[in-house]
Structures are given as structure tokens and as C-alpha cells.
């Protein structure tokens, strides 16, 4: 089915899309994925600060590099996470694998 105001899930993303467009940055699938990436990275940074085994990862440079993953998050990144999710059938696990891929670069 082709997307139009008549085939939208609700009037918010259909008829009122132009009035609610700014909300997409917070309530879209893309936003959900982006903020999940942010939460996972901030959790990891905090963990690295508290666990002696990970303490060497808690450098300022590493923190900046990690935060760059979500600060420069793109539509391509979200698409990659959806690709991973199609294999894992788990959205949060897909985010974890995506971050691991970024670590490996």
C-alpha cells in the first residue's frame, strides 16, 4: 500500500503531518533507535568508569569517540540496525550489535 494521508496509521502522521513534523525527531522509529543507541553508550561509559576491568576504556578520548556514534547518528545507521534486527528478531540486541560493529572499526 502506498503511503498517503488516507493510508497513514493515524491522523497525526497523515492529515496533520505538516503540523506534527517536528515531533518525528522524538517519536519516530528513527528517534527510538537513536535514543536507544545513546542510552546503551552512556550506560557503557558509566560501567567503564566503575568497573576496574573496564577502567582503561574510560579515557576522555574513548568517551568522545563513543559519544560521536550517537551524536553523528544517521538514517543509514538506523537502517543498518533494522537490517541486524531482521536477523536477530530483537531490537535492543540489534542496537548492541551495531555498537559492537562501531567498536570494531
Where are these regions (language model features)?
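A helix-coil-helix interface module used to build multimeric assemblies
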Residues: 2-105
Amino acid at each position: 500500500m502506498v503511503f498517503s494521508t488516507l493510508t497513514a496509521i493515524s491522523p497525526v502522521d497523515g492529515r496533520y503531518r505538516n503540523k506534527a513534523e517536528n515531533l518525528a525527531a522524538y517519536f519516530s522509529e528513527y528517534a527510538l533507535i537513536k535514543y536507544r543507541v545513546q542510552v546503551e553508550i552512556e550506560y557503557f561509559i558509566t560501567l567503564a568508569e566503575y568497573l576496574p576491568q573496564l577502567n582503561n576504556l574510560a579515557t576522555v578520548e574513548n568517551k568522545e569517540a563513543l559519544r560521536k556514534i550517537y551524536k553523528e547518528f544517521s538514517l543509514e545507521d538506523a537502517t543498518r540496525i533494522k537490517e541486524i534486527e531482521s536477523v536477530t528478531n530483537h531490537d535492543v540486541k540489534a542496537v548492541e550489535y551495531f555498537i559492537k560493529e562501531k567498536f570494531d572499526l
